[in-house]
Amino acid sequence: MGGVIPMKGYEAAYFTRGRNLVLSDTSDMCSPDWGDIYLAAKESWLLSEAGLTLYLSEGKREYLRKDCERLYLLAVNTEQKGTFLTAFDDKVSVFYFGEWLKCYFFRNGKNILDALEFSFAEYARIVSECEAFDEQLKSDCEKVGNGYYTIACASLRQSVAAHKLVETKDGKLLFLSKENNSNGCIGTADVSYPSIPLYLLYNPELVQGMLRGIYDFAKMPVWNFDFAPHDLGTYPWCSGQIYGTAQRDDKYCCGMYSTWASPRTNQMLYLRPAESEVYEKNMQMPVEECGNMLIMQAAAITAGADKSLAEENFSLLAGWVKYLEGFGLSPENQLCTDDFAGHLAGNVNLTVKALVGIEAFSLICRFLGKEELAGEYENKARTFADAFRVKVGPHILPLSYGGTDTFSIKYNILFDKLFGFSLIGQEVCEAETAYYIQKSNRFGVPLDTREDYTKADWILWAAALTDDKEKCEALYGPVVNYLAQTPSRVPFGDWYYSTRGDIVHFINRSVVGGCFAPLLKASGKCNVKR
């Protein structure tokens, strides 16, 4: 069903389902089967199949309504140049722990017709601003090196489009990602973390919008751990973390299993009491997520975001840094964000994340005027770094403690460098990146020694570690080749084989915002000493 709406100087044709079941299911690899689709121009039509055939064969535009025929939208302009608009109205964008939230544009009572009117009226200005942004981006990318602009173009819109921007009823901003093609979680902390270079560079308040949901869920009784959560549910339902739910086959856990690419509506796990024991501790990412939250919060404020969010959630941050103090130097057998590689004990990259997380907490304390505590944690970070050097020795940092002839991309060093602490040291950064170049394959350096697959976002984080432009280009150059030559013609896949160039999995994900790491470094926005 559908119709045509007369507007100011143009018309908008639309169609919709006979029954619009908003937010009726949720899963990865599933698109909404609700909402309205619009096509607008000077003249617009809703045509039956017979009407479309008449237009294509004779150029006649006539309203021909026939039941049980396919419907088509048609929009035409009679001049040589004109403007066409397409729009999708999802009615409701997100369920957020009991609140039904519309998209950000609709937050003050506006609707889809207001959006069309705004877009027509502001079209020239919007295009002009976009063109100016493109020119500036191209100029900035050329300073980074040859081919880098290609990666930026492939990353920017994909990363932004993998989020939904909404506002809670009390006016708090939420910028919620969908973990596309890797399980469909909403607001995943370790998906936000790799993406943040893009948002720190252009709008750090969006990083705060990523953090807010994790803070809110961490305060709920059902989350009874002393480390940070992984996610908020399955997009578009913030109904409680779905990752690592208990796999017991009993009457308390039935129906909690997360299934991939199977449309469903999740249970309201966020309502459950602490006694429910909903989550398996062994399937969480404790050091990973604590470090992520601390680093993201410190980076957001450093880049210019408001510090009140950190103030409101300081007790959580203080608890998470305590966890890193106790368990970060020698991580137990656990998962990290690269969970496809499985559990790993003594993960050196996780230890680096713990170190940077402790540094980040000292920064947060400094921003909040807690000078004594800031000094205390700066000293703790230095002590931690000294102990880390003793454990790893003077060689290339291994994949895990005791590992001989192993390596992994130590992307977690990045914010130690960007903040300006340099507790790891530039000598280590240069040695690591030189080694990565030696190990690089046709389409990039492998993520670690276990497999030949890699991650594009982490390669670009690594490229930002070196101050040598040629080395930076040598690291990201194979990613440019991958984008041009991969046989997997899909939206930018971030997890792929470094030798063959075909994807393993993971397409269309927000994490490619991390490809802006070299630009973020060049901006100096996260350097506290700037």
Task: Name what the model sees in each region.
Residues 78, 101-127, 184-328, 347-361, ...:
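Aromatic-rich carbohydrate-recognition surfaces in CAZymes
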Residues 493-530:
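Terminal, non-catalytic domain-edge segments
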Residues 173-182, 276-284, 307-311, 332-349, ...:
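Active-site-adjacent structural elements in folded domains
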Residues 23-54, 143, 179-191, 197-204, ...:
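Extended ligand-binding clefts on enzyme/binding-domain cores
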Residues 2-187, 204-208, 215-222:
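Acidic/polar, glycine-enriched structural segments that form the non-catalytic walls/loops
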Residues 87, 135-142, 193-205, 292-308, ...:
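Well-ordered alpha-helical scaffold segments within catalytic/enzyme domains
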Residues 115, 151, 205-217, 285, ...:
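Extended, well-ordered alpha-helical scaffold segments
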Residues 149, 153-154, 160-168, 187, ...:
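Aromatic-lined, polymer-binding surfaces characteristic
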